[in-house]
């Protein structure tokens, strides 16, 4: 399960992309799977770019350092290391999903690695649903699995402040088409969302203090 509700102080850059959402996966026997995890890899370091003290309501962040050495300093080497271990190149993947705190970070990282828009556009949902933090990459993967065909190869890379990235090399199996119609697609959930204005958002998130 990967899910979260993004927090951001009013007026902070974090609030601009704040979202909420999650995705859950059942991990089981390969013969029953709609996608196989072929290999995983992690890249971690002691890089504090985002934090919240126990007594504070909103998190703090290191502003531009959240990009580099934070995001780019982990997502890019994690993806590169996993492809090196697998002996693959960007051209070997039909789809790619990166952690997406905003649209600029993942597209820049993906272009740096040599991926194309056709490979990442299906799973890049942040422009429509915002930054779901721990759920970001996993929700993006659901959108990809909704349309993937048997044999399609997928690269997914997460990111967590602190900091670290986990990479996953996945392959869709022949069973993928059997499960794609058993539940509403991620795209259908997005298309039926209800837009609200900022005043409604502030009230629903209880950002107005009355004392």
Regions found by a protein language model. Give the residues of each.
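Active-site-proximal alpha-helical scaffold in enzymes
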Residues: 1-4, 9-10, 17-19, 25-30, ...
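Beta-strand segments within the central parallel beta-sheet cores of soluble alpha/beta enzyme folds
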Residues: 1-2, 36-40, 91-98, 119-125, ...
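Condensing-enzyme catalytic core mediating Claisen C-C bond formation in acyl metabolism
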Residues: 8-69, 73, 156-162, 167-211
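Hydrophobic alpha-helical scaffolding
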Residues: 61, 65-72, 95-99, 127-134
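Short, hydrophobic/amphipathic alpha-helical packing segments
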Residues: 72, 76-79, 134-138
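Phosphate/pyrophosphate-binding loops at sites that engage ATP/ADP/AMP, CoA/4′-phosphopantetheine
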Residues: 76-94, 113, 147-148
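Glycine-rich phosphate-binding loops at beta-strand->alpha-helix junctions
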Residues: 96-108
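A beta-strand-loop signature enriched in Asp, Gly, Thr, and Trp
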Residues: 108-140, 144-152, 156
């Amino acid at each position: 399960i990967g899910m979260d509700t993004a927090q951001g102080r009013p007026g902070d850059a974090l609030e601009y992309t704040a979202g909420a959402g999650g995705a859950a996966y059942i991990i089981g026997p390969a013969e029953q799977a709609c996608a196989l995890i072929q290999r995983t890899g992690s890249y971690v370091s002691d890089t504090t770019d985002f934090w919240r003290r126990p007594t504070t309501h909103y998190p703090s962040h290191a502003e531009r350092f959240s990009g580099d050495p934070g995001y780019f300093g982990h997502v890019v080497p994690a993806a590169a290391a996993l492809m090196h271990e697998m002996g693959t190149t960007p051209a070997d993947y039909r789809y790619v999903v990166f952690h997406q705190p905003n649209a600029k970070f993942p597209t820049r990282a993906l272009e740096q690695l040599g991926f194309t828009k056709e490979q990442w556009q299906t799973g890049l949902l942040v422009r429509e649903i915002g930054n779901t933090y721990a759920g970001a990459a996993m929700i993006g993967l659901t959108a990809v699995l909704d349309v993937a065909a048997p044999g399609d190869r997928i690269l997914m890379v997460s990111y967590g402040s602190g900091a670290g990235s986990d990479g996953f090399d996945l392959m869709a199996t022949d069973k993928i088409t059997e499960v794609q119609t058993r539940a509403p697609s991620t795209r259908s959930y997005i298309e039926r969302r209800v837009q609200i204005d900022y005043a409604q958002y502030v009230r629903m998130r209880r950002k107005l203090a009355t004392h």
